[in-house]
Amino acid sequence: MAEAISKLAEQNGSQVGYTMGELMVASAAREIRDSEVVFVGMRLPLIAFVVAKRTHAPNAVGLFENGVIRTTPAAELIYTMADPPNILGATQCLDMLSVMSLLQSGRVHLGFLGAAEVDRYGNLNSTQVRGPKGLVRLPGSGGACDIASLAQRFVVSLDHDRQRLPERVSYITSPGNGDGKNWRQRVGLPRGGPSAVLRQKQFCVLMMMARLTSHRFIPA
């Protein structure tokens, strides 16, 4: 059934000149403001950065965790942040410590993150989830906890699934607004927090059209 809905959604999207994936990219691109410094990441946010640069945010600057800083998108498709096209033509090639220092100093405006779960307060879990056979270990934080803690704001991108949107995550890998109630200030995270989650939602209403929804989190 899910496959049938996805196929129908893609067909309906094509009738108006775009696919659901393209709509997700456009929505992510709109989160990038001109002249902002952005922790880009990979996959969907990487394409969103290119779209933003070519439309409304020509002065945005892209950061990558491996130390690459770009004021122009890579000239060719990249699969990892260390691929040669991402190095060629970079504004700077530093190291992880240097770009994380930019983050710590408050000079990173936006970061794009993914997770296995996100709750109503914007807390992210990418460490462990409970499956049919018990706990399942996941890859963990990477740089996500740093970005969630220290960027001026962050945006979450994930596929819509009820299990991935619990009331409260079972494990906080990367902090959003904790339990609310000025939590970030109380624990020493005076700036930042989640601003939006971008998700592709599938539902059945008449023609079962798929929609992109942008959910705003409960503030700190």
What is each of the regions a protein language model found here?
Residues 6-89:
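N-terminal active-site beta-alpha-beta segment that forms phosphate/nucleotide-binding
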Residues 1-9, 76-220:
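Conserved phosphate- and dinucleotide-binding cores of soluble alpha/beta proteins
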